[in-house]
């Protein structure tokens, strides 16, 4: 046997050993998280999907059935199946138990708390979340991203792996798949696949997309004339020099669109300007690796967050984009998803390849800490969700139930959960929390 073949075998064996050691560590961390979870969550559901989803979003509606102890919410999901298997755009119904008035008779002596994850209401019913897929719509290839139109949530846009942007009207499809993908409209313009997709919250029928072909495209469904199922973009931007990873309309300023790229820049387009080869604002030198996502603060119009492969999150103030206002450090791998809390303007969620979803409270930046607290992370690190054992793919805040989150990992695991009120409430909890086991990395709490 040649010497280089022996070296190759050694390298392979070392890689296998490293992978096994990493998996053992992941499994151990998961066991610790599972043991601690009754103290960390008011409710939790982990469900194994048939296939992983790369995308998740709560629909804006909620039903409140009479004489029922739950509310009914809906989720938008996709699939990422194995080679040769069909893919679907999926809609799920989720029954969320109503939070009951705490009753001293529900006190759990073993855990030393009232109510909480896994407890029962005074009626004796367990506080359990129920999940079921209610509609499957055929989709060509995996769903890179799916988002509903805010003005009409039955209209859904998806990013396909061939670069097409597909528009589906959910009401025009049966609840079971037909076997043939049949979107209402195909938006043609990108030459490569992408993950950047965002509807215009100010104008119905308009959306923006970003792609690995380095372009940002604007679309206006109102220009569709019905002669074919295809529609061309209304405007093409070429201001980035590398892959465009994420795009977002500003939620408060109609003419602004934010874009981020592997070229390490955050850029702001002003659609009122005629030029399409440069942005109105360019923020450089904020990150040392690709910028994967951005999020405009929905309540403070000048604040933007960026997520990077350099493991950090940048906080920017649009009044001075020469440098970041602050850097959030706590993830151990690339940060890939960002979303601000829908009602708490200082709360930001971030998902990462490190399998963690972190909650940050920007209002705590600079707060004094004890040495013990500092070991758990910076003062603005509010909470660490450690329930996933694979890369975070996407997550979504529920707009009808504060602090209710859906998170999806690149394995089949989908989790629907609500962090314990004692951790995120402004006032300290009345009852002390028992001492938790010490996971690595540490769970962050008050």
Swiss-Prot record:
Region listing for Disordered, in residue ranges: 427-446
One Pfam entry name: WD40
UniProt cross-references to PROSITE patterns, sorted A to Z: WD_REPEATS_1, WD_REPEATS_2, WD_REPEATS_REGION
GO cellular component, one term: nucleus
Compartments it resides in: Cytoplasm; Nucleus
Signal sequence bounds: none
Amino acid composition bias (Basic and acidic residues), ranges on this chain: 437-446
Annotated stretches, region: Interaction with the histone H4 N-terminus: 372-376
Chief localisation class: cytoplasm
SUPFAM superfamilies membership: WD40 repeat-like
GO MF annotation terms: histone binding
Entries under InterPro entries matching the protein: G-protein_beta_WD-40_rep, Histone-bd_RBBP4-like_N, WD40/YVTN_repeat-like_dom_sf, WD40_repeat_CS, WD40_repeat_dom_sf, WD40_rpt, WD_repeat_RBAP46/RBAP48/MSI1
Spans of repeat WD: 138-178, 189-229, 231-270, 286-326, 330-370, 387-427
Keywords of the record: Chromatin regulator, Cytoplasm, Nucleus, Repeat, WD repeat
Family label: Belongs to the WD repeat RBAP46/RBAP48/MSI1 family.
Function as written in the Swiss-Prot or TrEMBL entry: Regulatory subunit of the histone acetylase B (HAT-B) complex. The complex acetylates 'Lys-12' of histone H4 which is required for telomeric silencing.
Complex formation: Component of the HAT-B complex composed of at least hat-1 and hat-2. The HAT-B complex binds to histone H4 tail.
Full protein name: Histone acetyltransferase type B subunit 2
